[in-house]
Each structure stands twice: as C-alpha cells, then as structure tokens.
C-alpha cells in the first residue's frame, strides 16, 4: 500500500503543522535523488506482479461466509521464511489495509527471458498454496476484488461492531468496524483518522443501486434526497478492496517516462476488461469496478478544495481525489495531449525548475505536492535530504494514481520503474497470470515497435468513468487512438528485421542472441533507427541487453540510452494524421482489431512474438493467455463482474430486490472457491477446462537453461 515507516504516528494536529516541512524537504530530496540517478543507464528488464487476497471463513452449518481477521497472524508465519532466507524465498508477503487482507509478490522479480512468462501462474499457485497450508479447513484465501457483504451486518469473524459515536474510533463508520483495519502497523488507522479529519467529515462514497423489479427505495442508509444510493462511509470500503498491480523496471529515466505515458491510456481499457466488483455492502450496484469507490474512500479534500465553499483556508481547488487517474503526461511526446488544466504548487514548481528539473517532470511533482501529508511518524520528521527520501515518498506514496512513476530507492540496485495500477483482482491464478503476461508483452511491443497510444488526458478521464459502467466490456465504447500508416509500417519493418537478423546471426557464428528467449528493454529498440545503425551487426552489447536479448533492431550501446536521438520523431504525427486521430472503439475492436482503424492489441503482440523463438511450453502458455484475452474482449467470455451478477440474479433465494443475502453470498463464494481450486467449471467465465491448458512451471527446465547459457542468455539464479 506504500511507504511503511516505523515509529510513533503523530496526531493530525501535529501532522498538519508539519505539512510545509514535509513538502519543502520532500522536494529537496527529489531534486537530490534526481541528479544522482538521472543519468543511470542500462538497467535490464525486471518486472513483477502484486496480488492482494482476502481471507474468508465459511460456516457450512449456517451457510454464512465472513472475512476472517487473521492477516496479522498469517503474516507473522508467512514472513518466517523470508527472515530465515531473504534471497531464497519464492514469495514475499506484506500487509494491506484490511485485517482480512494480505499481499503476495514473487520472491524475486521476473526478467527478460521469454521463459519467465511460464513461471508466473505457477508462482501465483504457490502463493495461494502457501497461505492455504496455514488456514483452518473452514477458511479460504481468495483473490476477489471485493467481499460482497463488506459493511453488511456481522461481516467479520470474529464479530466486530462499528462505533460511529466513539471519539477513539479511527473510522467512526456506521458499517465498517475499526477491528477490520490491519492492526499490525499504525499507518492504516492513522491514515483513516487523518483523512477523515483533514476532510472535516467522514468520506462519502455513493453508488447507484441496481434497480430490480422489487428493489426497495430508499436503500437502507441512503442520503436524504438520494433514495437509490448505496452509501459507504469509511476508507475501508475502498482500501479494503483487492487489486492486481504490475511494476516494470526501465533501462533509464527516459524509457520510464515513455512507458508511463504510453500505458496511461490503456488503464481504463484494462479496468473494463478486468471488471470484478459489482456488489457493495450486500447490494447489487450499477458499477462493475472498485475505482471510484477507492477514490472516494481516501478523498481528503475539504469543501473549499472540492469547490463547495469559497477558498479561504486552502490554496487550491482540486479536481480529483488523491486516488484517481493520472493528470499529465511526462514525456515530450505526451506534452500536447495534456489538455486538462493542471493544478500544481507554483512555489514547488519553481524550486524544482531552479533545481534543474525539466518542465514536464517538475509540474508532475508539483501537482503531487498540492496534497498534504496524512501520515507522519515522529522519528521521521528530521531527515538528511542528501541521503533520505522518506518525505518525498510520504507524498508520492499517498498519491494513488492509475500509473506511478517510481524513482530508484537510495543506495539500491533498483532502477527507474513504472507501476501499472488499474486492474481488478481475478478469481483464478490463470486469469491473473494472463492479465500480467499480456501487459508485460504489451510494454515490449510498445518499445520495440515504437507504438503511440497517446490520447488526450480529457478523453482518458472520460474512459475511466465509462470503464466502470455495468457490462462496459461488452456494451460501451472508448476513445482510442487510430493506427497510422507509419505505425503499421514500423511494426512490419521491425518484425522483418528481427527475423532476418536472427537468421543471419545464427548462420554467422551459431550464437544467436535473438533466440527468442529475450525481451527488449530500451526504447532505442524500434525499427526507426538510422541507416547506419541498421547496417551494423548485432554485437553482444547491442543484442543481449545485459543478458536479455532483444526482439528487434537496436543501437550499439545495449541499453539504448533511451534518449530522444531521433526517436521522438517516431511519435510525432503529421498534420494529416492529427485529423480524426481518435475514435470511439469497443473493447473488442481495441483488443482484436478493426479494419483500417486499428490492428488490435493482441494481433500486435502476436506479430511481435513471431520474431521470437519461444520454447514449446512457454508458447503454449502464452497462447492460452492471448486466446483468453481475445475471447473476453470479444464478449465470448464474460467479466468476473458480469458473472457475479448472473450468479446473484439466478440464485433461488434472490428476491429481485438487489439484495445479496448471507445465503447468496455464501453460495457465490463457495462457487468461487471451486473455480480457483479447479473443481468448478464455468464455461461462460473461463471456457471449458481452462486450468489444464497451460504448461506453467515453477522453474525453467534444465535443458532450456543449458540452451540459454549456450546462447549467452543465462538465467539469473
């Protein structure tokens, strides 16, 4: 969930008094960090996923399912392996907001080998099994985005009751007890309390109820004058949801900024594809996704900042919550698509510019810094700005956006990274692995083909709202950039060059660095390099990418320094192309293509893969993932959200009143348990026998490792 500093949390009054102190020193820390690391080059591709889980307890006698408040106990046991052998564990476990939630990641990041795609699902299975071994027979670990009856009466085990009138309560919620907040670190309750106090009132999350034939209005707890609203009133309703996130290491800062920008327009598209949360507080709603719920759950803006009162005590009108979609692009190519006025702190901006930060990055940081810190620890108030970054991370980590631009940590081997944050958690490891591998492959296609998905920020914002509508994946259309002839020619040229070079290299010395076991890192990998570069042979430095081969042509320096060096022109559209660049496309058209408009994300990935030699098992696994993505995008398979709705609407106990009763909730979660264990076949959701199709393994076979070593692409151990 972000920075977990150790120490004693300050009260809101103490934290508020230090807001400018944190802001001033956070800016200084970023400037110092930037100048230390801005010229860092040559980091290899590394990537990893984060899956959040909910622990569910079943009462099979009473036919009731509740969230089990066991996270602290489970984490203590799960972390024993890491403490004993930090470098040898296959998974890492961290706390999340809910006392019923845990977050799992791979023990080590995956790298640039094609074979790594075959490890992801197996590692996810291992994580699930690792937790399951610690659970009682009536408990289950589930990768569901939201517990359907979160906030309904008696939803926790042990039972806990909200205390809205208790001044010592962090949430003061009518529905969400403090006991459901993770107790093992003070950050979570501190954030809950301080967000409420800064706002001046409890957070207000409003969802339209799904109106069925017998839905009773007003909904229980609905605000005055809004009878059809399901009201949620605590941070836990949002931060108590689970998601699926990915982080990529770029070769340098320029590539990180480009990836940040190119992936941002895809965030609402992936949100719609992964929609998985239609039920809140035991009611079917008109929303399929968690995003606006979380956004409202941490909205600490005052009435002045929200435009409900004249500015007096506050400096800014702020358009969005601190949890929302990005507000500006970072790369030079994206600048002209920053079409929404950006609110930022002018003093912070000037300090950054004077400190040597360029305009686009300076306004991005200055925009983050319009927010006050909402969590501060006494031991972290005074820091060394030349070495520490906690004040910067304090603000950075509490701006939860669809994308996150992440500088390297101090004194670390980790490079510049970007985090992809919109996806909802899926029921099965197969689905989660498919989403992860698809997005990683897409980043390689973007860099290798120099694709341009840049879309005006205003249209991306519009897409974010569209993505959350009921059954948006099948019914809605999204603003998307048309493919240009330049893009199509570039992709075809890159593919042809890669295949020709691989063949030539193999014939020349038998040591083909383009053996298909590597993935490109470095935005110089596009086909539009100079003629001189294109004629140069593939040396170890240019092709191996520090042990990770490239699928396309690249420059001579291996890491392709990611600088502009003529590549910016690949992203610059002609005046003719600027006309009617953007069209409303369906999810099917975006993923599978529309003739003469856009080739489709999946066909682009398949084109890229044709230039790579992939071992048989990995090829089989990737193919199953791509087919799954294609079928869901086409509507042949339904989203988790749609499947959940259908399960509720067809349940014999459902009374056409929008209510998900305890029995319906129990049966739904039991069915989900069967799916994730491979015992329940759901053709509409996953097709037939999905779980037996992939060839996922938790290791790279020895024979393949020998081949990789022979070809100079050694697997890191």
From Swiss-Prot:
Its EC number is 6.3.2.2. It is an enzyme of class 6 (ligase). Residues 484-576 are annotated as: Disordered. Residues 492-518, 551-567 have a biased composition (Low complexity). It catalyses: L-cysteine + L-glutamate + ATP = gamma-L-glutamyl-L-cysteine + ADP + phosphate + H(+); (2S)-2-aminobutanoate + L-glutamate + ATP = gamma-L-glutamyl-(2S)-2-aminobutanoate + ADP + phosphate + H(+). Keywords: ATP-binding, Glutathione biosynthesis, Ligase, Nucleotide-binding. GO terms for molecular function: ATP binding; glutamate-cysteine ligase activity. The keyword Ligase applies. GO terms for cellular component: glutamate-cysteine ligase complex; nucleus; perinuclear region of cytoplasm. GO terms for biological process: axonogenesis; glutathione biosynthetic process; glutathione metabolic process; imaginal disc-derived wing morphogenesis; response to copper ion. Pathway: Sulfur metabolism; glutathione biosynthesis; glutathione from L-cysteine and L-glutamate: step 1/2. InterPro entries: GCS, Gln_synth/guanido_kin_cat_dom. Belongs to the glutamate--cysteine ligase type 3 family. Catalyzes the ATP-dependent ligation of L-glutamate and L-cysteine and participates in the first and rate-limiting step in glutathione biosynthesis. This is Glutamate--cysteine ligase.
